[in-house]
Amino acid sequence: GTETRPSETEGLQDKLWYKDIFDFYTVEGAVALHKRFKDWEGGKLVMAIPELPYKCPVAPIEFVCLAEAYFAERGMRDKVEISYVTLMSGAFTKPVASKVLGDLLEEKNIEVVSDFYMSHVDNENKKIVSYDEREVDFDILTIVPVNMGSDMIERSGLGDDMNYVPTDKHTLQSKQFENIFVIGDASNIPTSKAGSVAHFAAEILTENILAAMEGREMPAKFDGHANCYIETGYGKGALIDFNYETEPLPGTFPLPGIGPFGLLKNTKMNHYGKILFRWIYWHILLKGRELPVEADMTMAGKIRV
């Protein structure tokens, strides 16, 4: 699907790698960060996003929220400055969610540094530097490394310059080869690189493959449906549900007016929903059983703002 490429950012894997600079997308990185946090006495913690797209768009937001709760639990929150540094214009890619999630980070005293296009990491002075020469100091830097598609896709000639397969966003057919269909992170369709996207896309795929084999027009259209829970710390969470045309909006999910989950709301019920989803993943999704959530996104329960 997609892989992290820390070597794509100048200075990232220099002398501070896995000492004061970490990713959490690998076991090695997560374990090294855990050990560093255990004896850390405080300072400037920076979470940086240098490039789009990347696996699970809300993961960095979850990280800073959970880090904030972790340091509060340890009684040292007042000793830690947390910054969320992103090339986006706000906390998220879409305006309504960006405002809500940005306000949530502000409530937690987490600084959002936006429109920061990272050029390199200065290991000597412990700074990240943007192409327009802005600088952000850090004591500990956590980063979402540049994501790229598989080397196999590059070798096959199927991919673009990021090794993702150019794909029709509705039919999921390769734009280059009629006998190839693509779902999940391997495609370049303009939606999240997340498990929910692969799941919803898979539900329309069979119809189109059969139609292509029989020379018929492909009837099924994927709408880019994605949803995900966002852990926010303190036993609470948020939830977003959106597609190509509709950004994440507030409301209730999956039942209009009832929920029990709240869209773009920070609630304990959403946290319980994420915990429940672990069981759903192992006992329903992997066994091919149907979920009571349609592949196409619905506006039912959503409030336009």
Label every PLM stretch briefly:
Residues 72-164, 217-219:
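A Rossmann-like FAD-binding core segment of flavoenzymes
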Residues 183-232, 238-241:
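A conserved FAD-binding loop/helix module that cradles the flavin
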